[in-house]
Regions:
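Active-site ligand-binding patch in enzyme domains
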Residues: 3-7, 11-154, 164-167
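Flexible, gly/pro- and Lys/Arg-enriched active-site loops
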Residues: 170-185
Length: 185
């Protein structure tokens, strides 16, 4: 319970946990084209997990692929829509996504290193907020980003990304706890 508090006060970053779903053969993409890799119970646990965080970080690649809402869909907790940070360094987030319907109910930030005013204006008009960073290549870059997120007011972050981005976070030792959901298929 106090772990997040101590991390916040010592490092001025959010508590950073991550979750990943993998198939029986350790893949993160479902080749059978089913909507989900894991089962209904795992999904309920993930929705409960999301309810415990004030923000979620994902990537445009993951969101574009899944068209995911990244919210909590448990009765009684379904009003809990953690704010969303989307790492989109090259501004490739699709314009038509299901999560656009939640912009009025939750803050959605796009993290980019592109200063393209025309492209960022399109997202701003939809209600996205833009966070500009120089790069995201090493531990210092990640810590700088996480300090910005903490400074905005977020103290607990759940990361839901693909294997490539997750590996970068693990390599740079920026994750405090990792939840792995392994499918029996």
């Amino acid at each position: 319970f106090y772990k997040g508090y101590f991390i916040n006060k010592k490092s001025f970053i959010p508590l950073i946990d991550a979750k990943i779903a993998i198939s029986k053969d350790y893949l993160t993409i479902n080749k059978k084209k089913d909507k989900w890799i894991t089962n209904k119970t795992s999904r309920k646990i993930v929705h409960f997990l999301r309810s415990r965080y004030d923000c979620i970080l994902s990537t445009s690649k993951s969101i574009n692929h899944d068209d995911s809402l990244l919210n909590c869909r448990i009765n009684g907790l379904n009003n809990n829509k953690p704010d969303l940070f989307i790492v989109d360094l090259n501004l490739r987030l699709k314009k038509k996504l299901s999560l656009n319907s939640y912009i009025g109910n939750r803050k959605i930030y796009i993290i980019t290193n592109k200063k393209n005013a025309k492209r960022t204006l399109v997202y701003k008009k939809k209600g996205y907020k833009i966070i500009l960073i120089k790069r995201l290549e090493n531990k210092d870059d990640f810590n700088l980003l996480f300090k910005k997120i903490y400074k905005i007011g977020y103290s607990r972050m759940l990361i839901e990304v693909g294997l490539t981005f997750l590996n970068a976070l693990l390599k740079n030792k920026t994750i405090h706890d990792l939840y792995i959901f392994k499918s029996s298929k």
